Amino acid sequence: MSASRLLGGGRTHGRTLRLFVAATRTYVRSVVELGQSSLVLESGNLARLADGSAFVQMGNLSILGTAMRRRMEAFYSRRKPLLVDYRERSVAVGKIPITQKRRELGFSDVELKTSSIVQRALTPLMNQENQFDVQVLLTLLSSDRNLDVETSCINAASLALGVAGTIQEPVGAVCIANIGDRLVVNPSIDERSVADAELVYAGCRTGATLVQFRGRELSTSELNDMLYEASSHVIKIVKAQADIISNFDQQAPTDDLSYEEIFELGVKIKPSIKVIPTKELLHTVRMVAAPQLSQILQDSESSARGRLEGMLRLERETGRVLMGNSEYVSRELITRSLNKIVVGEIHDNIRASGRRCDGRKPLEARASSYECQILPEVHGSTLAELGETQVLCSCAVGRLDLSMMRGGYIRGEYLQSLFVTWERPASAIATVTNSSFYYGKLEVDRAELIHSSISPVMDQEYSYTVRLHCDVLSSDGNGVMAAVAPGVLAMLSAGVALKRRVSGTSVCAVKRTSTEFEAEGEEEEGEEPMLILDPTLIEEENCCYILNLAGTEKGITMISLDLLTGKPPPIDVIEDMVDVAYTSVRQELETINEVEIVPRKPVDEEVKLEVEIPEGSRSKIIALRGSSISNIEEQFDCQINISSRGRVILYGKSEDQLQEASETMLNLVAQGRA
């Protein structure tokens, strides 16, 4: 049977079927010197059938990145047109998985967090005119236990997207560590563990697309030095990527089949629906929606729920008007157009009146309150109210044997004793979803921000396992950083040893996008972004970029910057956002320090003993798992943890007791008993 008959029963209407032909590949290699290490960028040698491929090496670390775009236009929601998947293989370090089937299973938290970081760094610079979904696959081919993979993954993904022609300009990434007032570029994992601060910076020629900072209470001046140092190295990486990309011919998306063409060929599939607003559509949406939108944003007496319901009504009414006049306007397109209009309206209303939608000034934070020990059976609990945002944090403390060995083959094992989870059900933002309690990339990423904010002030000698759970009961913006202060208070209520109290806040910037300027015939040059402290939900979802910051009275512990739309912010704008946020944090700490806490009775103190096992006997130690270990634990009233690499840690009430248990275990190994 012919291909034409398979596609449409012979009804081709005289149209010739065009097949995608990949561009001719040439091998290009570039080396960038970064401090004491060299970053090798290659393309054109591996994965030649992909739209774009990149091979990145640093030391023994090797990452393969491939980029593919869908061959047909997307007709569903494309709020996240870039999908990133990062996978680690135990074979990258010459190991065999210890799972029953001896292969890797689902995504680990490390893989989810790395995928999320890469996606956040690159999504803002994806070509908005591209109607095709893009997928980036990152695979760890060879591991270097002295180097982390985050920045190499961003560089590999950016180069692959650049070769594929689906990104506006290359993005480079680098890690900077502050070790004893000395800045180290791309530090080793051991150096990062002892560093006073570390910064993951991703950006292009004009500014930053992602900033991830965690430190042991660093000052703003030290942070600024790290930002400028990182920016100078990123520019070199971006230039090297641009030189490589210039050697490849990008395949134009118009050469692929669109939905209209496939529909004419007889395939039963949905017609193409554009999702990028045009100037004419933006003008029409503004004419229809502007009066009601201004009323919603200027009514300071309205509640958060009232504003959300008003926005939903506005979206429905605007859609009803526009979809009644044209069959080519989708609801997704209307939503995107409204988002662009809202950014400009927020900007204009604040410029005109000096007030925001809830009546506050641009740099005014909401009043906050904290109530501790509201859950009697929980070790520690705190309810925080920040305007109409409510966060309930609960803390449980257990024995240290409940800690987990993390890292595994790839990153080196370490003992994690603080576990943070963050959840925001759909009811918190007055919506309904198919599954309200789904824990995915977003939740893992938000929990990591809270963990990075609090962990620098934890006492390293605290020998207990801590679980902190943050429930966002209602969210009118700032739902992540609003959980930092109550989380700290809940941990203190549970008896956790902390050096100082921590608080967090968010700062976002609103600025009319380039599309709006073009629609109005204005110029974007010279337009400064407007900073908004402690944003509401509407402001948070319709800003250009947002910065989350946490810190103590002594210094900053965490910073996270995300670019949502528009051009990347330069470093001087980031400095202004940091100053505004940290000033607010120090003011909020005055309120938090006044909260009185009566700690619960601490858990019985226990002793830890780590046993050094010769490399030749580690397999025998692993084989002891089961009844033999259970008998030893029962006999000596202790807990024994054995990792997949044969590392043994014993927990008990006395050191003599643990010494006897370890001797018994080693005797079993010597006798060869399992």
What are these regions (language model features)?
Residues 121, 152-164, 226-229, 233-237, ...:
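Stable alpha-helical structural segments in soluble proteins, enriched in small hydrophobic residues
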Residues 164-295, 491-599:
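Mobile "lid/hinge" segments at catalytic clefts and subdomain interfaces of large enzymes
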Residues 23-70, 74-81, 252-415, 604-631, ...:
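Extended amphipathic alpha-helical scaffolds
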Residues 26-78, 83-259:
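Long, basic N-terminal domains or extensions that often function
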Residues 29, 125-134, 168, 237-257, ...:
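Flexible, glycine/charged-enriched surface loops at secondary-structure junctions
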Residues 50-134, 140-142, 205, 223, ...:
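Glycine-rich, flexible beta-strand/loop modules in the N-terminal catalytic cores of phosphate-handling
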Residues 436-439, 443-556, 561-674:
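Conserved structured catalytic cores and adjacent interaction surfaces
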